[in-house]
């Protein structure tokens, strides 16, 4: 999901180009509160269970009820300046600075220094999915699915009740 702020307008744009701002008002309010004129933040909307773990099924029911949060992992544009050509470390540092003090609706995604298999084993033990991030749509995106995660066990649905 891209959180796009341009002046006073905030949109939450899905991969399919749909604006979900009306569904996630807490995220919109958090982006509106940022001390910038404009920005584009790349992230994933999540809802957490009572243990603080992302829960896909819970997110389905949060479509019309906050709290859902945007787990931010990249800053693509800031105050009209494109950052896509900057190193990911610089973009993440600017994103961390931008989100510093943000209390609700937006969180900075964790970065792990451990090797991928170690991180995946921790995610698997927690019942989480697990993805490796790369900016933009790419064939290099690697999503290793945990077959035991609740999101993998659910039945496919055509409509989320939007």
What do these predicted regions represent?
Residues 1-162:
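Catalytic cores of nucleic-acid ligases and guanylyltransferases
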């Amino acid at each position: 999901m891209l959180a796009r702020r341009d002046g006073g307008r905030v949109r939450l744009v899905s991969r399919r180009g749909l604006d979900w701002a009306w569904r996630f008002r807490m995220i919109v309010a958090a982006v509106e509160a940022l001390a910038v004129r404009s920005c584009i933040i790349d992230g994933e909307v999540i809802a957490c269970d009572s243990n603080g773990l992302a829960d896909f099924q819970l997110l389905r029911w949060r479509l019309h009820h906050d709290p859902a949060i945007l787990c931010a992992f990249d800053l693509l544009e800031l105050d009209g300046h494109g950052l896509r050509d900057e190193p990911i470390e610089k973009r993440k540092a600017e994103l961390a600075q931008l989100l510093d003090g943000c209390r609700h609706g937006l969180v900075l995604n964790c970065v792990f220094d451990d090797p991928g298999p170690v991180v995946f084993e921790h995610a698997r033990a927690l019942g989480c999915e697990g993805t490796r991030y790369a900016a933009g749509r790419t064939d290099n995106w690697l999503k290793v699915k945990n077959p035991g995660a609740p999101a993998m066990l659910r039945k496919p649905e055509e409509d989320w009740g939007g």
